[in-house]
């Protein structure tokens, strides 16, 4: 049984016991910027588990730009979230009850969960499966540098970008969880790295902490002019998280045999009408360039390759990462909005509860 509570713009949160499962449901598909109108708070009973199933309690949620794509009713690499269903999200959870021989109560796992306190998961199924956290790895590490964002940076740059020593790498969305790691891996591979980010604080962090050679502040600078200035010999790899006018500006400065890694297009996700594509795609032809998109789910069989390499770089201090941690179940809808307004600094996470 599900009970929903709404009071104008406010949500009425009630005291709950262990028998109640709080949820945030997708109430309406977004048209433009995501807002409170897209979600509804609900309460339901904690589900029972069947054979080979595991009941988990969600401790921490991941917020990722691609969640906007899961909310719209169009074909994608995952089915859209249904209206009236809990919103999908990556999570670190604790096993509460298990009918599966490989999982025991108390263990921490990473999975594709939802915006709710409790969930039933089936090991071996779902986009990400159900994976135990490696020893010594915290929930925030598992959902940031060692999770989807870190693996996206690693495989996108290494497999599609194929960096070579001495090349110039341009990164949009450079202060984000993925972009900041892309730039640091590129530096480790002997490349010169130029980032594009928004705001003085983020730009300073990228040069002073993450080791970028230069950063363009799109909020206060002419991006096209600054790309030309900071990439006088053009760029060899453009790792694009933003799309839109930034992609078009970058394509004017592609080097011979340059590679564009299409990771995301956050500047267009909340558009109310289709955004026009770049008008200068012929630059790929004249420069024999390559533009390729990718989905991290295709690389999951190689996940440990990325995790082991990233763990080593973090342990040695060669890679740093930032986490923007929100707290409180009631703050979930407001937290996802931070991604699309540029308020977050680093990987956006939200803590629901501590492990028991």
Locate the predicted segments by residue:
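Glycine-rich beta-strand-centered segment in the early N-terminal region that forms part
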Residues: 46-63, 72-115
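Short, Lys/Arg-enriched N-terminal segments with co-localized hydrophobic residues
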Residues: 4-17
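Mid-domain Rossmann-like dinucleotide-binding core that forms the NAD(H)/NADP(H) cofactor-binding site
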Residues: 143-221
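NAD(P)H dinucleotide-binding glycine-rich loop of Rossmann-like/cofactor-binding domains
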Residues: 89-94, 101-173
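Short amphipathic alpha-helix with an adjacent loop that forms part of the alpha/beta core around
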Residues: 223-232
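Short, glycine/polar-rich helix-capping loops at beta-to-alpha or helix-loop-helix junctions
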Residues: 116-117, 198-206, 275-281
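Glycine-rich phosphate-binding loop and adjacent beta-alpha segment
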Residues: 245-319, 352-356
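C-terminal capping/lid region of NAD(P)-dependent oxidoreductase domains
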Residues: 19-21, 318-325, 333-356
